[in-house]
Amino acid sequence: MPQSSAATARAQTRTEAAYSRWAPFYDLIFDLPFHPGRLAASRAAAAAAGKDGAMLVVGVGTGLELELLPADLRVTGVDISAAMLDVARERVARKGLRQVKSLQVMDAGAMDFADGQFDVALAPYVMSVVPNPARVLSETWRVIRPGGRMVVMNHFAAAGGPRAAIEAAMEKAAWWLGWHPKFPYAAVGDWIAAQPDAELIERRKLPPLRLFTLLVIGKRAQS
């Protein structure tokens, strides 16, 4: 295995371990602080999908987004953590979320879906988690149909000031946290700029404290 692939595999193993630790109490800690962004991203993705649209949720985790999505969608969720998906499945069963058609353990960087299978993809708080964001972006892009959209909700590191110093200090514990506090916007922005069929439709900061950013990226229809 090449060095880069080996490093990615090790990082992914650490991520799986981190979210196995988080799974039992993830919702208790991350539900309310992340809810405004989660709600905005879910609404943007649902609007893009339309009635009976096929939606992929990348990094679905414990499924906090699922109950925010309309019942007339056809939702598939993937996550690398089986422990997180166990919580999501229990949520779907308990709340009768009929829009959820499938929840699968899957590497977001190598998904078992056909090209253009989905109308829209929602990637909530996942790009600063995965070992190779560009690979996940490209793979998510592949499974969106031309004319579809990708909705990304994420934290991006501050350029300077006290918040940047805090993020730099927290980055030392990224292996334990399961995400990278010092995650630059360029990791996503440069990828968007490099795609000839991509258009950044919306970029909007959201509460709390404008810590999170919503991106809506359109995939141009083939001429």
For every predicted segment, state its role.
Residues P2-G50, L64-E65, V87, R91-K95, ...:
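Conserved class I S-adenosyl-L-methionine
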Residues T13, M153-P208:
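C-terminal alpha-helical "lid/dimerization" subdomain adjacent to the S-adenosyl-L-methionine
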Residues A54-A110:
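Class I SAM-dependent methyltransferase SAM/SAH-binding core
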Residues G109-A121:
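A short acidic, Gly/Pro-enriched loop at the edge of an enzyme's catalytic core
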Residues D119-N132:
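A short SAM/SAH-binding and catalytic strip from SAM-dependent methyltransferases
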Residues A134-P146:
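A short glycine-rich, Lys/Arg-flanked "PGG" loop and its adjoining helix->strand segment in the class I
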Residues L215-S223:
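C-terminal lobe and adjacent flexible extensions of AdoMet/dcAdoMet transferase-like proteins
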